[in-house]
Amino acid sequence: MKVDAQILYDTLHEVPHLVQAAEAWGLDAVWFSETAHDPFLAAVLAAQSTSRIAIGTAIALAFTRSPTLLAYLAWDLAALSRGRFMLGLGTQVRAHIVRRFGMPWAPPAPRMRTTVRAVRAVWDAWHSGAPLDFRGQDMTLSLMTPFFTPPPQPHAIPIFTAGVNPPLCRVAGEVADGFHVHPFHTPAYLRDVVLPAITRGREKAQRTSGPFEIVVSAFTVIDGTEVSADAARRALAFYASTPSYRGVLAHHGWEDLGQRLSVLASRGRWAEMSTLITDDVLHAFAVVAPREEFGNKLRERYRGLADRISIYEPFAPSQAALYRTLIAAVRT
């Protein structure tokens, strides 16, 4: 397995130092999420500040940007990074798309399928010089003149999609080059639900022979400290309160937990939510281990399930020893 890092930052000024540290330690990739910042701006700084490490968005919101805009962003980043950029796309949930971004909502799986195919159609037009002619569900792209065509660049751009439930997993298998497993997962859910759905998508699209990477971000509780355990419980409670993620809980017979957490969240009783995350739930969703055993336990947990692994906690230069231990264990 490859070892990646999730990069979080308060200001863009921090990005070069963080990604240079990740590259110096031998990590394989850095990923930028779309929470309080635009991940593409951070990816530009990462590309300019490094020479080897791969750079990706995990994830950028697909439904708040047009496919053509996504195509331009990824094309320029692939050129700037000399082929190190990976485009990771996700859906978010309806409330954020409609109420935070003011954009229309549509069924996410068909829309993601159309978005990825449209991005590839734009790239194909730029590569070949042929007229742009994409006709998908609720979308047509038919205008691309030489004036608006960027200079050629030789690098392939892998597209990763993300999701939790089977429909988006199947779409990833149909149209993507890899899949970001949501941090709110268990190995059982990954093995029993996510991977079979991806396989069905790949079989449907007759894409079973090409490469496809499974990217996992894992919750961790290292050395059993209360601070670490409480942080994991808070994050798990937040995700478990989201109705869209209820299927993961249902796979373990914990539907009632999700319903109770949703009620608390709707009433703003955030401080109480983490108390509902029992030790059994914590151990199902998180890697709980002493520091010296952490790398080996992570490797065994995801052996045969993942191709790339990172830990959910934000990357920090103070974690050098932890990441070196992780790299040594996971790559053996």
Task: Describe the residue ranges of each PLM region.
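Active-site-adjacent structural elements that line small-molecule/cofactor binding pockets in enzymes
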Residues: 1-332
